[in-house]
C-alpha cells in the first residue's frame, strides 16, 4: 500500500504540518512513548488503522461497532481526543477546511449530536448493507457523502471517511487501491473536494449529489491511470497485447466480472476471452474466484 503518501496526505488535508519525508522518518523509527505532539500522534494512529485495514479487511464489516472501533484506533495516540474516541459526538460540529496558514473555514453545518446523529448513522449503515442495485463505486461515494454530512464523531471524520473508502474499495474487489494513494489525489484537489461538498450541501435536504459523485469517481479514475502508467514504466504493461490491456482494464473497473460479460463488452468471441484470461492468470495479474459457471475475475 502507498502508505507514507496516504498517511501524510490524509492528515495534511485536516491541517497536519508533517511532510511525506517526516512521516517516513516517524514510521521507520516509531516509538509510541515519544509521540508528544499532535501531528505525530495523528499520523501514528492513521498508519495503524490503514495497516489494520490492509491486513484484515475481509473481516472488517461495515457496522456501527466496526466504524466506532476504527475511530477508536485512529485516535489511539491523540492526547486531546481520549475523551471522545470511539463514540459518537456529544457536541455539534461542522465540516471545516484547513489552510496552510492555520486558518479554518466552515464548509457546512452537520447533524446535531445525540439522537439525530445516532439515527442517521443507523439508517446510513443499514442502507449501504441492504442496497444491491447501485454500482459499488456509486454506493461508496454516496456513503462517504452522507457520512461527512452527518459528521458522527467529534473529530477525525474526514480522515476516517478516507480510511472507510479504502476499506470498502478493498472489500468490493478494487485491490489496486493498495498500490496508489487515494488520499494524495484528494489532497491535490482539496479545493475541488470542499467545493463539491459545499455545492451539494447548499441544496439540503433534497440535494442532488451528482457533482460529488463525479468528483469522487474522477479521483479514482485518475489514480487508476497513474497505476497503469506505473505498470507501463515497469515493463509489465508493455508485455500485454491490446486485447489483454482492454480486458485487464475492464476487470479493474468491474471486480468479480465473468468471462461472458467481458466478451459481450468487447464484442469478441468467448473462447478468445477465456484464452486471454488464462494468460493474465499465468502472468499473475488477475485471480479467479468460484468454479464452473460462477467463475469471476479480479485484479491481484
Describe each region flagged by the PLM:
Residues 1-300:
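FIC/Doc superfamily catalytic core
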